[in-house]
Structure formats: structure tokens, C-alpha cells
Regions:
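A fold-level detector for beta-propeller and closely related beta-sheet-rich head/sensor domains
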Residues: 1-263
Length: 263
């Protein structure tokens, strides 16, 4: 994967207060990508409000990070027999946050910014038609308490309804993630937060940020491969994920977790 992408052009990915994450070529400044995270969509009309100058709004305010990930990671133990037949699926993923513009994070596949077509099984080209393949995960939402939540009760498939309810509960521990990515001391182009864990799976490890609904500090382990599930570790007191933060709130309420350093 590294050899195949050795000549890949350099890219700059920056959040903008126009509501988008932009991707520009480092050599010419040519825009290759513009993505509007789901969490900022409801307040985009504020950009043209006559009174905007009197009430500044934040949109895509977080600092993105990138890393190379095997999307098939964890599917087979390297020590198991037959591992020589294992076929990895390497991609370069970008993890972005909204910072003060909203809560949560999103994940994009930015493997090949020069591709115009994408054969089956390869990295998607940067086109609107490939949006569903480029966006691996979008777990962003606005910062207001009045923002509508998914109507899980209207779902008729039991599994989908359960997943919807679980996602709502998980989101209560995700706040404004404002911390800058933690960089590798030996390679400033690499974030240590996107990493392979000891279970052979790939994940991004983040603090949950501030002003979450549950108001407690939580370590987020968002898997980037396979089913992309979210694991949470409450970082203080005797709490577990299932503990009601309003009951056992020792050193918890009005709190949050910044960016962790993975060792």
C-alpha cells in the first residue's frame, strides 16, 4: 500500500466556517473535496442571516487527522493458521470533528484524491456519485438541546430500532471535541490516535470532549474497520458505561476528556 501510493499528491484538509471540510492539493491549491457534515446542516441558513455579524457561528471548527487503516483488520488472528491467505484492504482515512461548531466526529475515505473512476473493491474516487463510499461514518450533530433526535419508535424492524436507541444513548457521552490531534513525536504528519489495538483491530481513540449530555469524561474507542462499533470507557470515579451519571457523579458532572496519548 505504501509503495503503491508513494507518488500520491500531497493534500491539505481544513475545516471552514462555510460549513464544509475542504481538501486541496498541496502543490496547486486545487480543491478536490468539499464535505458538509450532517451536524452542521440545520444551521447552514444562518450563514446568510442579515444579523450574522452580530452573532458569529462556528461550523467545521475541529482539526482533522488522517491515518492508514486495514479495513479488514481483526477478521483473522495473525497467529491463526491460514493467515498467509489473508487479503488486507488498506485505506487512508480522515477523522474530523466539529469543534465548537457541534458535537461528534466523522470519518472519510481519502485514499485516492486523483482517481476519476473506482473499480469494484478499490478506493472511491472523489465524486458526488461516490459520496456513500467516501463517507465511512458521520456521528455529528448540532450543539443545541432542541435538535431533533431520530424517531426510533417509528422503525418497524426490531434490530434497526434497537440500534437506533443504542446510538442515541451513546451520543449522550459525545460532546464538543476541540482538542488538536496528538502527533507522533518522530513524524508530525502522523496522528497516534489512529492506531491498531492489541486485538488486531483499527480504531481512532479520542476524548469525548466537553458539554456532552451526560457531562462526564469518557474515552471513546471508535473502531474504523468491519462493523465500526463504538466502545466507551468512563474515565473517572466508579462509573461504568451503564451507570446513571446523575446518580454517581463523583468528579464527573460538568466534565469532559481531552485528546489522549496512545502508548
Amino acid at each position: 500500500f505504501v509503495r503503491d501510493n508513494k507518488s500520491r499528491p500531497g493534500m491539505l484538509y481544513v475545516g471552514g466556517n462555510d460549513g464544509m471540510l475542504h481538501g486541496f492539493t498541496a502543490s496547486k491549491g486545487e480543491e478536490k473535496l468539499a464535505y458538509v457534515p450532517r451536524g452542521v446542516v440545520p444551521k447552514l441558513p444562518l450563514l446568510t442571516a442579515p444579523a450574522y455579524n452580530a452573532g458569529h457561528q462556528y461550523f467545521v471548527d475541529g482539526s482533522p487527522m488522517t491515518g492508514d487503516v486495514d479495513m479488514n483488520g481483526g477478521m483473522q488472528d495473525p497467529k491463526a493458521g491460514g493467515y498467509d491467505d489473508y487479503v488486507p484492504d488498506w485505506r487512508t482515512l480522515l477523522v474530523g470533528t466539529l469543534g465548537l461548531g457541534g458535537k461528534g466526529y466523522f470519518v472519510l475515505d481519502v485514499t485516492d484524491p486523483t482517481a476519476t473512476t473506482a473499480p469494484s473493491g478499490s478506493a472511491p474516487a472523489f465524486t458526488e456519485a461516490n459520496a456513500a463510499s467516501l463517507v465511512k461514518l458521520d456521528r455529528t450533530r448540532g450543539s443545541t438541546a432542541t435538535e431533533p433526535v431520530p424517531n426510533c419508535a417509528a422503525m418497524t424492524v426490531a434490530a434497526e430500532k434497537t440500534a437506533c436507541l443504542e446510538a442515541i444513548e451513546e451520543d449522550k457521552d459525545i460532546g464538543h471535541i476541540t482538542a488538536k490531534p496528538v502527533l507522533d513525536e518522530n513524524n508530525a504528519m502522523r496522528s497516534t490516535q489512529i492506531t491498531r489495538l492489541n486485538n488486531n483491530r483499527w480504531a481512532v481513540v479520542m476524548g469525548n470532549g466537553y458539554n456532552s449530555t451526560n457531562e462526564r469524561p469518557v474515552l471513546l474507542i471508535q473502531y474504523l474497520d468491519n462493523t465500526k462499533e463504538l466502545k466507551k470507557i468512563v474515565a473517572t470515579g466508579a462509573q461504568t458505561v451503564s451507570t446513571d451519571p446523575k446518580v454517581d457523579n463523583t468528579n464527573v458532572l460538568a466534565n469532559g476528556l481531552s485528546a489522549p496519548k496512545v502508548v
